[in-house]
Amino acid sequence: MRRLTVRLFTAVLAALALLTMGTPAHATAPASPSVTFTNPLAEKRADPHIFKHTDGYYYFTATVPEYDRIVLRRATTLQGLATAPETTIWTKHASGVMGAHIWAPEIHFIDGKWYVYFAAGSTSDVWAIRMYVLESGAANPLTGSWTEKGQIATPVSSFSLDATTFVVNGVRHLAWAQRNPAEDNNTSLFIAKMANPWTISGTPTEISQPTLSWETVGYKVNEGPAVIQHGGKVFLTYSASATDANYCLGMLSASASADLLNAASWTKSSQPVFKTSEATGQYGPGHNSFTVSEDGKSDILVYHDRNYKDISGDPLNDPNRRTRLQKVYWNADGTPNFGIPVADGVTPVRFSSYNYPDRYIRHWDFRARIEANVTNLADSQFRVVTGLAGSGTISLESANYPGYYLRHKNYEVWVEKNDGSSAFKNDASFSRRAGLADSADGIAFESYNYPGRYLRHYENLLRIQPVSTALDRQDATFYAE
């Protein structure tokens, strides 16, 4: 009897182990739910910088094509900046320094005051570009007065621009781009600690110079540094090459506990992390900044680009760089993934599986499936658009294949080009439902032309099938991220 009891107990343990191994985790709502925007946010606004303040407002400044003034607008939402009234807070000098090429303003709130960092040339030499700072003690920087704090002095007086400031472990730093007379290039990247918001302290360190092929097209440029911190790491993006379709983002990374003034602490990406996309019609994305969503749960990439490739004349004289927004995603290794500059219009989202929370809907050889660690981000991004079949439906358009949609065929789900037929429109349309396994936060997609069949994963492949069991409902529930 004792031997039988032991055998029975062992069998039960084995069965429980098998069940545990075969049962996926049940997800909770994602820590970073979806956010969407409509691009472009602002026409003819380059080098954009958006700062979210504790007063509930976003503050937005950028280079204007006339290069003659600093403008500012604010709104309580990011999308609201598109229509917010714009105020000129400072105008170039009629003569002397700060009299030409007013470029790349950034607004920061430091120790109870507002500061704007910008670059400017002189009326006697428009290319004598240096970095300058404005200060305001007003609660509302759009209506307050501004004081010129003067030039940010550097040990070497040379072409310098694109100052940005950030704090790591309680220490404020300044990063910027500057011509190093000892090098055969246009600008390199430097970093220093700050004694106050308009003065650097100690000896600056050069942390990057343009040496890679994609950094030296047209001009040899590293410029426009911007910093985002995540998971104990500091990521510094920068722009490279000429300001045409070759403009792109590179990235330096360092541990937040490292000595950031030691050039060896920084590792450079071997390839651009964000560049032109012919597929989406976006050219020369760059000179970015970072902000956060209204709920503080998503990091947002702010940048400019053009929607055409060929420029007549000097790109510097082309006024049509536009400010754009899109969400930053994070890879499993903790590095940021910017994907591609998405098409104009509504921005795409990702859909994670309810019961396999690390897996996302993506296409591979145009077959739709769920998969983890999708480093080619755009394969897992879809625009939620008005359904091709109408009648209150939605369709899911591929981010990197505009005009291609998730559609079912023989109950299998593929990403295919819209051929304009009624059959395609019906197959590519879904009714958006509350999640079948999580009605509060989840989403389910019911086939338009096969009511009762839902988009679900089965052996990692997407299909449309009826749902009846608890497992069916889990497989047919997703979260938008």
Curated annotation (Swiss-Prot):
Residues in the signal sequence: 1-27
Record site: Important for catalytic activity, responsible for pKa modulation of the active site Glu and correct orientation of both the proton donor and substrate: D162
Residue stretches in coiled coil: none
pH dependence: Optimum pH is 6.0. Stable from pH 5.0 to pH 6.5.
Enzyme Commission number(s) of this protein: 3.2.1.55
Residue numbers binding substrate: N186, H287, R321, H363, W364, D365, F366, D379, H457, Y458, E459, N460, D475
Organism: Streptomyces avermitilis (strain ATCC 31267 / DSM 46492 / JCM 5070 / NBRC 14893 / NCIMB 12804 / NRRL 8165 / MA-4680)
GN (gene name): Araf43A
Name of this chain's protein: Extracellular exo-alpha-(1->5)-L-arabinofuranosidase
PANTHER family (alphabetical): GLYCOSYL HYDROLASE, HYDROLASE, FAMILY 43, PUTATIVE (AFU_ORTHOLOGUE AFUA_3G01660)-RELATED
